């Protein structure tokens, strides 16, 4: 192993079994867990995020869970700051940071760094949101393809948050998001370790998912149904009762939450809400797979295998993470 301390990434699509495997690893390795999930950061959003139970979190603490109120925003840049701080603390105690979750942008930002993008502009964002409502997301994707074809190729036409942000960057700065990132990458080469994406760790990257995509779809549908049985609608109803929360916030736009919110607003029937929630979760999983297919050096595990712990330990030994 190089002189860098070790770290483990445990990635994968939603409903693949990442948390269960991570907890098993903490029982046999000197690891501490860091959540890599843009929804788990929010307090009071437990059922719809499939957040580990209070009992599990007490026995197996996860950093970066329940750190924000749902009215607040959380960026990939802030995640990098928080995650690097947590990793440094864990390493200083002689333990291994084990990062687990499915927000692939956060992993990418941690490894490659983020370009310094212009700040959000409320007026521009409101104009783009109005266009999306009036003309549809397809029109926004068409506009993005004209000014930033590289970003348009990366961003799904049904991903409003990223579409709007990419167009916002262009309108505010006059430069595409791709141009910002390319300049940042050029400037970061040769930078000090830990800055601008030169992660000062030797990372073992693992991903877990069923080898049969149909099985993952079944797991997604089952989990969404279980969430509803556990009181997901009441959870969103409690959030909706707050005067400071609305459907445009990143927390409420999280998969599942926006569909239940629309149901409570009377825009969807109960069956439509459940169907759209499952579809949205499947689309999220598809995007996660897309990210993972381009991830260098990832070691895949089958969610249904009974020996994933031993396979993981064997792999970590082979790449000298445990030496």
Swiss-Prot record:
Quaternary assembly: Monomer.
GO biological process, one term: tRNA modification
Gene, per the UniProt record: miaA
Family: Belongs to the IPP transferase family.
Cofactors that this protein relies on: Mg(2+)
Disulfide bonds: none
Chain positions recorded as substrate binding sites: 14-19
Biological role stated in the UniProt entry: Catalyzes the transfer of a dimethylallyl group onto the adenine at position 37 in tRNAs that read codons beginning with uridine, leading to the formation of N6-(dimethylallyl)adenosine (i(6)A).
Designated name of the protein: tRNA dimethylallyltransferase
UniProtKB keywords: ATP-binding, Magnesium, Nucleotide-binding, Transferase, tRNA processing
Residue ranges of the region described as Interaction with substrate tRNA: 37-40, 161-165
Enzyme class, UniProt record, top EC level: transferase
GO MF entries: ATP binding; tRNA dimethylallyltransferase activity
Entry EC no(s): 2.5.1.75
Site (Interaction with substrate tRNA): 103, 125
